Protein backbone atom coordinates (compact mmCIF):
# COMPACT_ATOMS: atom_id res chain seq x y z
CA UNK A 1 0.00 0.00 0.00
CA UNK A 2 2.90 2.34 0.68
CA UNK A 3 4.00 2.12 -2.96
CA UNK A 4 0.49 2.68 -4.29
CA UNK A 5 0.24 6.01 -6.08
CA UNK A 6 -2.61 7.71 -7.89
CA UNK A 7 -1.74 9.33 -11.19
CA UNK A 8 -4.49 11.81 -11.95
CA UNK A 9 -3.47 11.96 -15.60
CA UNK A 10 -4.12 8.23 -16.11
CA UNK A 11 -7.24 8.24 -13.96
CA UNK A 12 -8.62 11.10 -16.06
CA UNK A 13 -7.86 9.18 -19.27
CA UNK A 14 -9.59 6.08 -17.90
CA UNK A 15 -12.70 8.11 -17.12
CA UNK A 16 -12.68 9.88 -20.48
CA UNK A 17 -12.46 6.56 -22.34
CA UNK A 18 -14.46 4.38 -19.97
CA UNK A 19 -17.42 6.55 -18.99
CA UNK A 20 -19.00 6.86 -22.48
CA UNK A 21 -18.76 3.07 -22.90
CA UNK A 22 -20.35 2.52 -19.48
CA UNK A 23 -23.10 5.06 -20.19
CA UNK A 24 -23.70 3.44 -23.58
CA UNK A 25 -24.25 0.04 -21.96
CA UNK A 26 -26.54 1.55 -19.33
CA UNK A 27 -28.55 3.48 -21.95
CA UNK A 28 -28.88 0.34 -24.08
CA UNK A 29 -30.13 -1.74 -21.14
CA UNK A 30 -32.58 0.97 -20.13
CA UNK A 31 -33.78 1.36 -23.71
CA UNK A 32 -34.56 -2.34 -24.08
CA UNK A 33 -36.27 -2.24 -20.70
CA UNK A 34 -38.57 0.49 -22.03
CA UNK A 35 -39.17 -1.50 -25.22
CA UNK A 36 -40.20 -4.49 -23.10
CA UNK A 37 -42.58 -2.27 -21.14
CA UNK A 38 -44.17 -1.13 -24.42
CA UNK A 39 -44.44 -4.74 -25.62
CA UNK A 40 -46.24 -5.65 -22.39
CA UNK A 41 -49.22 -3.68 -23.71
CA UNK A 42 -49.83 -6.47 -26.24
CA UNK A 43 -51.32 -9.90 -25.61
CA UNK A 44 -49.26 -12.66 -24.02
CA UNK A 45 -48.76 -14.53 -27.28
CA UNK A 46 -46.96 -11.49 -28.75
CA UNK A 47 -44.55 -11.34 -25.82
CA UNK A 48 -43.94 -15.07 -26.18
CA UNK A 49 -43.33 -14.76 -29.92
CA UNK A 50 -40.84 -11.89 -29.52
CA UNK A 51 -38.96 -13.73 -26.78
CA UNK A 52 -38.58 -16.88 -28.85
CA UNK A 53 -37.61 -14.88 -31.95
CA UNK A 54 -34.87 -13.08 -30.04
CA UNK A 55 -33.48 -16.38 -28.74
CA UNK A 56 -33.29 -17.85 -32.23
CA UNK A 57 -31.75 -14.66 -33.60
CA UNK A 58 -29.09 -14.77 -30.87
CA UNK A 59 -27.68 -17.94 -32.48
CA UNK A 60 -26.12 -15.65 -35.08
CA UNK A 61 -25.99 -12.31 -33.27
CA UNK A 62 -23.90 -13.53 -30.32
CA UNK A 63 -21.02 -14.72 -32.56
CA UNK A 64 -21.00 -11.29 -34.22
CA UNK A 65 -20.93 -9.62 -30.81
CA UNK A 66 -18.03 -11.86 -29.78
CA UNK A 67 -16.05 -10.87 -32.87
CA UNK A 68 -16.66 -7.21 -32.02
CA UNK A 69 -15.44 -7.74 -28.46
CA UNK A 70 -12.24 -9.46 -29.61
CA UNK A 71 -11.73 -6.78 -32.27
CA UNK A 72 -11.79 -4.02 -29.63
CA UNK A 73 -8.85 -5.62 -27.82
CA UNK A 74 -6.95 -6.30 -31.04
CA UNK A 75 -7.37 -2.76 -32.35
CA UNK A 76 -6.40 -1.25 -29.00
CA UNK A 77 -3.19 -3.30 -28.88
CA UNK A 78 -2.22 -2.46 -32.46
CA UNK A 79 -2.94 1.25 -32.17
CA UNK A 80 -0.91 1.27 -28.95
CA UNK A 81 1.96 -0.37 -30.85
CA UNK A 82 1.51 2.14 -33.70
CA UNK A 83 0.52 -0.68 -36.07
CA UNK A 84 -2.28 1.28 -37.74
CA UNK A 85 -2.30 -0.74 -40.96
CA UNK A 86 -2.60 -3.96 -38.98
CA UNK A 87 -5.49 -2.50 -36.99
CA UNK A 88 -7.26 -1.59 -40.24
CA UNK A 89 -6.73 -5.08 -41.64
CA UNK A 90 -8.19 -6.61 -38.48
CA UNK A 91 -11.24 -4.34 -38.81
CA UNK A 92 -11.99 -5.34 -42.39
CA UNK A 93 -11.24 -9.01 -41.75
CA UNK A 94 -13.64 -8.98 -38.78
CA UNK A 95 -16.21 -7.19 -40.92
CA UNK A 96 -15.88 -9.83 -43.64
CA UNK A 97 -16.25 -12.70 -41.17
CA UNK A 98 -19.29 -11.10 -39.54
CA UNK A 99 -21.01 -10.38 -42.85
CA UNK A 100 -20.40 -13.96 -44.00
CA UNK A 101 -21.74 -15.42 -40.74
CA UNK A 102 -24.83 -13.21 -40.63
CA UNK A 103 -25.74 -13.31 -44.33
CA UNK A 104 -25.24 -17.06 -44.80
CA UNK A 105 -26.75 -17.83 -41.40
CA UNK A 106 -29.74 -15.56 -42.02
CA UNK A 107 -30.42 -17.19 -45.39
CA UNK A 108 -30.36 -20.64 -43.78
CA UNK A 109 -32.55 -19.64 -40.84
CA UNK A 110 -35.05 -17.94 -43.15
CA UNK A 111 -35.84 -21.36 -44.62
CA UNK A 112 -35.77 -23.06 -41.22
CA UNK A 113 -37.93 -20.54 -39.37
CA UNK A 114 -40.95 -22.75 -38.92
CA UNK A 115 -39.07 -25.88 -37.72
CA UNK A 116 -37.00 -23.76 -35.32
CA UNK A 117 -40.01 -21.95 -33.90
CA UNK A 118 -41.84 -25.27 -33.49
CA UNK A 119 -39.13 -26.33 -31.00
CA UNK A 120 -40.35 -23.60 -28.63
CA UNK A 121 -43.98 -23.03 -29.64
CA UNK A 122 -46.51 -25.69 -30.59
CA UNK A 123 -48.27 -24.57 -33.78
CA UNK A 124 -51.41 -26.57 -32.97
CA UNK A 125 -51.76 -25.41 -29.36
CA UNK A 126 -50.73 -21.78 -29.91
CA UNK A 127 -51.09 -20.85 -33.60
CA UNK A 128 -51.16 -17.08 -32.96
CA UNK A 129 -47.82 -17.07 -31.14
CA UNK A 130 -46.32 -19.47 -33.68
CA UNK A 131 -47.27 -17.42 -36.74
CA UNK A 132 -46.32 -14.16 -35.01
CA UNK A 133 -42.87 -15.51 -34.18
CA UNK A 134 -42.29 -16.75 -37.74
CA UNK A 135 -43.31 -13.31 -39.04
CA UNK A 136 -41.11 -11.51 -36.48
CA UNK A 137 -38.10 -13.70 -37.33
CA UNK A 138 -38.36 -12.67 -40.98
CA UNK A 139 -37.68 -9.04 -40.05
CA UNK A 140 -35.02 -9.95 -37.48
CA UNK A 141 -33.07 -11.98 -40.02
CA UNK A 142 -33.55 -9.30 -42.67
CA UNK A 143 -31.54 -6.76 -40.66
CA UNK A 144 -29.20 -9.24 -38.94
CA UNK A 145 -26.19 -8.32 -41.14
CA UNK A 146 -26.70 -4.67 -40.18
CA UNK A 147 -26.76 -5.65 -36.51
CA UNK A 148 -23.51 -7.55 -37.00
CA UNK A 149 -21.84 -4.61 -38.75
CA UNK A 150 -23.01 -2.34 -35.94
CA UNK A 151 -21.31 -4.61 -33.39
CA UNK A 152 -18.05 -4.57 -35.36
CA UNK A 153 -17.96 -0.78 -35.62
CA UNK A 154 -18.79 -0.48 -31.92
CA UNK A 155 -15.84 -2.74 -31.10
CA UNK A 156 -13.63 -0.74 -33.45
CA UNK A 157 -14.52 2.60 -31.87
CA UNK A 158 -14.11 1.26 -28.35
CA UNK A 159 -10.75 -0.30 -29.16
CA UNK A 160 -9.58 2.97 -30.72
CA UNK A 161 -10.60 4.87 -27.59
CA UNK A 162 -13.40 6.71 -29.40
CA UNK A 163 -16.05 5.52 -26.98
CA UNK A 164 -18.01 8.74 -27.46
CA UNK A 165 -18.93 7.46 -30.93
CA UNK A 166 -20.19 4.21 -29.41
CA UNK A 167 -22.39 6.23 -27.08
CA UNK A 168 -23.63 8.36 -29.99
CA UNK A 169 -24.47 5.31 -32.11
CA UNK A 170 -26.25 3.48 -29.30
CA UNK A 171 -28.24 6.60 -28.44
CA UNK A 172 -29.20 7.31 -32.05
CA UNK A 173 -30.21 3.73 -32.85
CA UNK A 174 -32.25 3.07 -29.72
CA UNK A 175 -33.38 6.37 -28.23
CA UNK A 176 -33.66 8.63 -31.28
CA UNK A 177 -34.97 6.08 -33.80
CA UNK A 178 -36.32 2.83 -32.37
CA UNK A 179 -38.19 3.91 -29.23
CA UNK A 180 -39.89 6.97 -30.81
CA UNK A 181 -40.87 4.93 -33.88
CA UNK A 182 -42.33 2.13 -31.75
CA UNK A 183 -44.39 4.67 -29.80
CA UNK A 184 -45.46 6.47 -33.00
CA UNK A 185 -46.49 3.29 -34.82
CA UNK A 186 -48.28 1.93 -31.74
CA UNK A 187 -50.16 5.05 -30.67
CA UNK A 188 -50.52 7.21 -33.78
CA UNK A 189 -50.57 4.79 -36.72
CA UNK A 190 -51.94 2.00 -34.47
CA UNK A 191 -50.58 -1.00 -36.37
CA UNK A 192 -50.17 -3.17 -33.26
CA UNK A 193 -47.31 -5.66 -32.70
CA UNK A 194 -45.61 -5.01 -36.08
CA UNK A 195 -44.66 -1.62 -34.61
CA UNK A 196 -41.77 -3.37 -32.86
CA UNK A 197 -40.16 -4.96 -35.92
CA UNK A 198 -40.86 -2.08 -38.31
CA UNK A 199 -39.15 0.27 -35.86
CA UNK A 200 -36.28 -2.21 -35.53
CA UNK A 201 -35.74 -2.23 -39.30
CA UNK A 202 -35.88 1.58 -39.48
CA UNK A 203 -33.46 2.04 -36.57
CA UNK A 204 -30.91 -0.43 -37.97
CA UNK A 205 -30.98 1.13 -41.43
CA UNK A 206 -30.68 4.56 -39.81
CA UNK A 207 -27.67 3.39 -37.79
CA UNK A 208 -26.10 1.98 -40.96
CA UNK A 209 -26.48 5.33 -42.72
CA UNK A 210 -24.97 7.14 -39.71
CA UNK A 211 -22.05 4.69 -39.66
CA UNK A 212 -21.36 5.27 -43.35
CA UNK A 213 -21.35 9.04 -42.79
CA UNK A 214 -18.93 8.71 -39.85
CA UNK A 215 -16.69 6.39 -41.87
CA UNK A 216 -16.66 8.80 -44.82
Regions found by a protein language model. Name each.
Residues 1-18, 75-143, 186-214:
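Short alpha-helical transmembrane segments in multi-pass integral membrane proteins
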Residues 3-34, 59, 63, 67, ...:
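Hydrophobic faces of transmembrane alpha-helices in multi-pass small-molecule transporters and flippases
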Residues 18, 50-58, 95, 137, ...:
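Transmembrane helix-bundle signature of multi-pass membrane transporters/permeases
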Residues 21, 25, 33, 37, ...:
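Transmembrane alpha-helix boundary and packing residues in multipass membrane permease domains
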Residues 21-29, 33, 65, 97-106, ...:
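Hydrophobic alpha-helical transmembrane segments in multi-pass membrane proteins
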Amino acid sequence: WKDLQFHLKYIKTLFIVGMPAAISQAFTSLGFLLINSLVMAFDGYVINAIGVGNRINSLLLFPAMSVGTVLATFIGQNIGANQISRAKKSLWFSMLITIMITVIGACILLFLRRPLVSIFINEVDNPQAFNMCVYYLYFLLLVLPLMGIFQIWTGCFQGAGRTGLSLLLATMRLWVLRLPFIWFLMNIIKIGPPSVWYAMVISNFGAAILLSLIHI
